[in-house]
Structure formats: C-alpha cells, structure tokens
Regions:
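Conserved S-adenosyl-L-methionine
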Residues: 1-67, 82
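C-terminal catalytic and target-recognition region of SAM-dependent MTase-like enzymes
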Residues: 61-64, 68-156
Length: 156
C-alpha cells in the first residue's frame, strides 16, 4: 500500500473478483426439517454467521427426501427425547437406519444425537464416534459410510 505505483482501485477490483470466485466454488449446503420453527431458527443462525451464504433450508421430512446430488455428505441431528417420546425413539432410529441403508448408499452420514441408547438402534456401524456437548446435553457425533450390500461384499 506504500508502493510507488500502488493503485487502490485496481486492488479493490482484484479483491472483489477474488471473493466472487471463492463464493462460486462453495458447496451448496441444504438443510431440511419438518418443523417450521427449526427452519426459521436455522436460517436466522446461518444468516447471522454467514450473511452471503450458499445455504438452502427448506421444509421436508427426512423420510421423503431423496439424495439431491450424487454421493452427498449427510448430517443428521434427529430429535432426542425432546420432540419424540422416549418409548418411540428406538423405533424412530431404526427407521432412520433403514432409510439411510436403502436410499443413501454412496453417501457419508454423520449423525449427532443425545440419545445414546437409541443411536445403537440405527443398525449401521459407525467408523468414528466423537463425544460432544450440545449445550448441557452430552451427545455423540458418529460417522457412518453408506454403501450397497454388506461390509463383507465391499471388501471382497
């Protein structure tokens, strides 16, 4: 900036062009929920942190959702004992596991849950488990690669 031939207008133009190119290369982040309150809260939080973002948050039930792109990364934060009664959680998590296995093969699934017992009912083996806290609630973030068939078939 203290260079003899410094051109401030050119510098600003280069910065703006660079920022445009960076934003064009950003992945699209899609969020879905079937509770309007969660959609509004998500949009508000995202816009507060990233005003010029590439996020699309819409109303849709996970069980009606098809992969929007080939081999996506899927991040789930299913309800844990807050929106669903405890006795129904195990069945709900089994349904999540079935949907992941049959609809999302080729994807990488990450699931954040505070219901550690129900998480076992997904029926798919995680390759990574990370202990986190969602506020005061102890949670696990598990990574489950999804593929067709069984793990034995994958490595034959």
């Amino acid at each position: 900036m203290n260079h003899k031939d410094y051109d401030h207008a050119l510098w600003e133009k280069l910065k703006a062009k660079s920022l445009e190119e960076i934003n064009e290369n950003q992945p699209t982040i899609m969020g879905f929920d079937n509770f309007n309150e969660m959609i509004i809260a998500s949009r508000t939080n995202i816009n507060n942190v990233l005003p010029n973002n590439n996020c699309k948050i819409t109303f849709k039930d996970f069980f009606d959702l098809e992969p929007p792109v080939e081999n996506p990364m899927l991040i789930l934060n299913p309800p844990y004992n807050v929106r669903i009664a405890q006795e129904k959680n195990h069945l709900f998590y089994e349904e999540i596991g079935s949907r992941l296995k049959h609809t999302w093969s080729g994807s990488d699934a990450w699931i954040l849950s505070g219901d550690l017992e129900s998480l076992k009912h997904i029926g798919l083996r995680p390759i990574r488990r990370i202990k986190l806290f969602n506020g005061p609630i102890e949670t696990k973030l598990v990574h489950i690669p999804l593929y067709k068939g069984s793990k034995k078939d994958k490595y034959r």
